[in-house]
Amino acid sequence: MKQGLFHIVVLALCLAFLSPVAALAQNAETSPQTAVTNMSQTVNVLNHIIFMAQENRGLDHYFGALREYWRNNNFSDISFDGLPQFNPTSGAAPLYRPPRTNPGCDPAYPPPNDCIEDKNSPAVASYHLITQCIENPSPSWNEGHVDWNLHNPLSASPTLNGYVYTGAHDARNNDPPFYDTDGIRVMGYYDDTDLNYYYYMASQFATSDRWFSPVMTRTSSNRDYLIAATSQGYVYPIGTDSKDQKLLTAKPIFQVLQSAGISWKIYVNPENSPCASNPTAQCLLGYSYIQNFQWGHTIPQNFPNKLVPISQYFTDVKNGTLPQVAMIEPASPAGLDEHGSDSDPYPINIQLGAKYVESLVNALMKSVSWKDSAFILTYDEGGGLYDHVPAKPAQSPDGIKPVDLLPGDICTGATGPTCDFTYTGYRVPLIVISPYAKKHYVNHQIADYTAILKLIETLFGLPALTNRDAAQINMTAFFNFNIPPWKTPPTPPAQSTSGSCYLDQLP
């Protein structure tokens, strides 16, 4: 499943005093009914937060070589937990010989056999990808749990050695099979020669090495958390199991904003969709994950000017008319969401997706809206791509167990600690871009991206949606609200689009 850019533009309020912020950060496990201290009573410096979630990329996969970029480009070498070969102890030289962390498929059992992991399996290390297009590994429920521990997915002990197996298993069982039937694409990573714009922005502004997707499964459920801090038990897209067709009754953040009189919009890119010539709210609803919620279906009739085409974003940025909270959906029909290629009419090129994000961010930085905005870029889940850091324990949003597991799925018989919603998914990239974002800053606090909701709630004095967002950090540590470090934004390099794109070989 694809989709994904979410931007939030927030009328805000932040801090003249850091003591209340520290208190909020420490008081993370409050109930959903407990309203957060109204930061608007301090200094109103952020009026817009823009947040965007692209598709299916893990932290090691995209930013694993970030410290190497710093070494080569005169950035101070601060702590960042990327790929082990680029993550030596302070002052030591990089290893450059990546550890072989995942067993591969025994070559004696080629397709149509399933991937067999045994004593003859070659050990596979991470490596630099040359192609900017890869076949999609699956990050779904079963695969995510096998990634956690190949031989015992229900174990409390993560080994993170199942990535190659799941990549191979899915490739061999796809119809038609993928090229990479050995699953080694999951161990590939990119660096600044591929994603020069992202590497520059992550180095200049604020990022994190402990930022996780909310659920150990695929896109749809994670994006439900992005909007409402729960999927109400769904681990698959609604309707995967024919008996599970009900829309979510949980309150999305936009419903709460509407009730509180806080302006909001959802921007959708209609390119290459039927909405291109008819970008009405009713048409655009089909390309927004707000459609998963009952309340979302009231938008076309009741709030049609709040579900709008992406062209309106550029107009709002230019004219200084951004709403207080805005979410930008991914340009999936246009192939600009950075998702792995998966029966698409053409390969999905990450450089083209990054170029699209560049256009959104640069438009903001060059506009009158820059002075009081924050743009939060993240990814909806790790895409089944190797990451050396395991998922972390998390607060269940509402106590609901999985409701749509299929016969034979992991956790349908025996159970384990990752069988409900008390663990996050895997790490995903994050860049916080704002005149108030700290320069060259890495946050190390464990959080999933429902922390974006917590930031909104903190800024506006809103109650938490569920126990999950209530338990998150409020993200104020990413900012310096007293003195804006980036009153004048930097001039980033243009994102390269000259990389090779092919699916029929690796690397």
Model-derived segments and their meaning:
Residues 26-507:
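N-terminal pro-sequences and low-complexity stem/linker regions of secreted or lumenal proteins
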Residues 19-27:
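Bacterial Sec-dependent signal peptides at the C-terminal "C-region" and cleavage site
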Residues 1-9:
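Bacterial N-terminal signal peptides that target proteins for export
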Residues 8-20:
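Bacterial N-terminal signal peptides
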